[in-house]
């Protein structure tokens, strides 16, 4: 028996779980490619004789596509196996970057053609997250959901930290080489997507360790396309119905939406402030990197914390720490290095907060509906991001940095208050005490 077989997985579940590991690797490669896109798109548009304003417009189209596609991506994943959805995403992104490379090498200056290709691969990339969550729910025991979420947090933070510098370095050599590198990342991601057999094996191993009442198990076909008997709109409505019917899920949607409004607006406000104060883009990058470093550090603690603390305690401590850091920024933002330290400290509890939410959703939602539920929960987050982006610019121009930072910090405090007053969130148990509906 090899170390990677399901029979030995309980000794070190995540490290031995090839279905999870290959999924995490595929997502890491896709997210690194995505993090490089900001540099790639900007350089590509300017190389086509476009202005910075035109580059911003193309980036806006991609962001808008990501938001709208994200609303229904979970529903789409629920109507196909997560493996097929991940293959579709990787393939489309690979072909998309090949198309952009061909466009660049042809000498074309068609911004419209470039935008259409980028919109297509951006839409496809939104299938990644719900596919990963569905595979995790199917193959990872409930006691390891916190660690699985922590790996995802660390992976995303690492991609954000290193993606832009790597892209800038490669672009300095050749823009064509950068485009080829991004396509290659997505192609390798396609190659490491877990096999159907691997997912089925770990699903069976999980269910055999935690047998469902009556000895039933969830098969691959059970979760492959649960919505095929109804329309995609009906599946979308079902995701919302499940969230609205569960007071805890509804509270999670409210808390995450409000918190994300604050965490989107405050960094932008600080960027505007430091730019207006004459700081170079390098120092602004250092500030954003400090937060990412904090998230990376915090991700190493999630497994330890989720084993010992209730999810409610994790969530309250995380939101409280972030709120305290944002309130501190109101007063210390004129001092750059003090702000960077506070940003790094505020990033440490974020993985625990996200892990507690994702672990609860994955443990308490049946596998067949996980994609649509995650999409429904993501709507408030995605809906408030553009509002926060707009508010940061408008309020900074009208009020200045201090008042704008205080405005956003108040929303973070409000999310903490909701965590404290909602019984469903205040009483969440430890991960080990959750009843896993997928076992």
Model-derived segments and spans:
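Small-residue hotspots at the loop-to-helix junctions and early N-terminal turns
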Residues: 40, 49-57, 281-288, 375
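Hydrophobic core of transmembrane alpha-helices in multi-pass small-molecule transporters
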Residues: 28, 109-127, 338-352
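Hydrophobic alpha-helix/TM-entry signal in multi-pass membrane transporters
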Residues: 19-27, 86, 114, 248-253, ...
């Amino acid at each position: 028996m090899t170390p990677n077989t399901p029979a030995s997985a309980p000794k070190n579940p995540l490290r031995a779980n090839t279905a999870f590991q290959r999924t995490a690797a595929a997502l890491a490669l896709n997210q690194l490619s995505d993090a490089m896109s900001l540099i790639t798109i900007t350089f590509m548009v300017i190389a086509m004789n476009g202005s910075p304003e035109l580059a911003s417009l193309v980036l806006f189209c991609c962001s808008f596509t990501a938001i709208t596609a994200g609303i229904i991506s979970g529903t789409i994943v629920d109507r196909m196996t997560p493996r097929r959805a991940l293959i579709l995403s990787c393939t489309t992104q690979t072909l998309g970057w090949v198309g952009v490379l061909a466009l660049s090498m042809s000498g074309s200056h068609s911004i419209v053609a470039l935008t259409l290709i980028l919109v297509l691969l951006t839409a496809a990339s939104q299938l990644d997250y719900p596919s990963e969550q569905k595979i995790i729910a199917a193959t990872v025991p409930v006691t390891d959901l916190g660690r699985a979420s922590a790996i995802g947090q660390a992976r995303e933070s690492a991609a954000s930290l290193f993606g832009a510098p790597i892209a800038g370095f490669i672009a300095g050599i050749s823009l064509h080489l950068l485009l080829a590198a991004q396509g290659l990342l997505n192609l390798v991601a396609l190659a490491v997507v877990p096999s159907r057999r691997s997912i089925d094996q770990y699903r069976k191993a999980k269910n055999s360790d935690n047998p469902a009442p009556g000895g039933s198990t969830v098969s691959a076909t059970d979760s492959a396309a649960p919505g095929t008997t109804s329309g995609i709109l009906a599946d979308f409505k079902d995701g919302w119905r499940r969230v609205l019917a569960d007071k805890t899920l509804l509270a999670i949607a409210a808390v995450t939406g409000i918190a994300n409004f604050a965490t989107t607006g405050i960094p932008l406000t600080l960027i505007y402030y430091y730019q207006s104060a004459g700081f170079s883009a390098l120092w602004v990058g250092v500030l954003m990197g400090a937060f990412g470093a904090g998230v990376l550090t915090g991700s190493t603690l999630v497994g330890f914390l989720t084993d010992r603390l209730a999810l409610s305690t994790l969530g309250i401590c995380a939101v409280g720490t972030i709120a305290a850091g944002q309130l501190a920024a109101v007063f210390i933002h004129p001092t750059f290095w003090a702000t960077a330290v506070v940003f790094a400290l505020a990033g440490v509890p974020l993985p625990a907060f996200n892990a507690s939410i994702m672990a609860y959703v994955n443990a308490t939602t049946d596998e067949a509906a996980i994609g649509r539920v995650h999409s429904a929960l993501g709507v408030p987050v995605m809906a408030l991001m553009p509002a926060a982006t707009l508010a940061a610019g408008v309020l900074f121009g009208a009020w200045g940095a201090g008042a704008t930072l205080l405005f956003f910090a108040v929303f973070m405090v409000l999310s903490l208050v909701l965590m404290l007053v909602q019984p469903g969130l205040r009483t969440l148990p430890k991960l080990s005490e959750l009843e896993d509906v997928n076992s």
